[in-house]
Amino acid sequence: MKNVTDSFVSLGHWPSAGSFGVNTDILATNPINLSVVLGVLIFFGKGVLSDLLDNRKERILNTIRNSEELRGGAIERLEKARARLRKVEMEADQFRVNGYSEIEREKLNLINSTYKILEQLENYKNETIYFEQQRAINQVRQRVFQQALQGALGTLNSSLNNELHLRTISANIGLFGVMKEITD
């Protein structure tokens, strides 16, 4: 752009030695030069300007048509979306109503199952207590029996002498003899 401006400025400073030039000084130009320049601009610029305006008009009209088509499509999609929204709202209301009754049913089922589990745990607890009681009783019996046996063995060992030992053996032999006679 600067080169074009420089070339017009340089045209105005050429020496006037019989050559053709454009006078760029507005105050020094004559009406003929102005009318020639304006005529050339109007003649050649009219077509260019007309084409530019026609192109701009076509683009604006195309944009308006596209906008109308998009608007129509948007309105159609909006109506479909509203219909879907109404349907979803109705389904949501139905789910809400069904959900409350389902929640109550699940709540009752949960309470009943929890009650059954608590009963089972109570039964297991009672069985465990009974088992532990029986085990404790058996342990006490074993200890009492062991202590009684140890006491009896201690008493026998302390009071046992050879004479008593021989008498016991003789008595047992006698018992075996009597048993043998009975079986024969």
UniProtKB/Swiss-Prot annotation:
Domain of life: Eukaryota
InterPro entries with a match to the protein in the record: ATP_synth_b/b'su_bac/chlpt (IPR002146)
UniProt KW keywords: ATP synthesis, CF(0), Chloroplast, Hydrogen ion transport, Ion transport, Membrane, Plastid, Thylakoid, Transmembrane, Transmembrane helix, Transport
Signal peptide: none
CC per GO annotation: chloroplast thylakoid membrane; proton-transporting ATP synthase complex
Keyword Ion transport annotated: yes
GO molecular function terms noted in the UniProt entry: proton-transporting ATP synthase activity, rotational mechanism
Segments crossing the lipid bilayer: 27-49
Membrane topology summary: Single-pass membrane protein
PANTHER family noted in UniProt: ATP SYNTHASE SUBUNIT B, CHLOROPLASTIC
SUBUNIT field: F-type ATPases have 2 components, F(1) - the catalytic core - and F(0) - the membrane proton channel. F(1) has five subunits: alpha(3), beta(3), gamma(1), delta(1), epsilon(1). F(0) has four main subunits: a(1), b(1), b'(1) and c(10-14). The alpha and beta chains form an alternating ring which encloses part of the gamma chain. F(1) is attached to F(0) by a central stalk formed by the gamma and epsilon chains, while a peripheral stalk is formed by the delta, b and b' chains.
HAMAP family per record: ATP_synth_b_bprime
Additional note from the record: In plastids the F-type ATPase is also known as CF(1)CF(0).
Family recorded in the similarity comment: Belongs to the ATPase B chain family.
Protein name: ATP synthase subunit b, chloroplastic
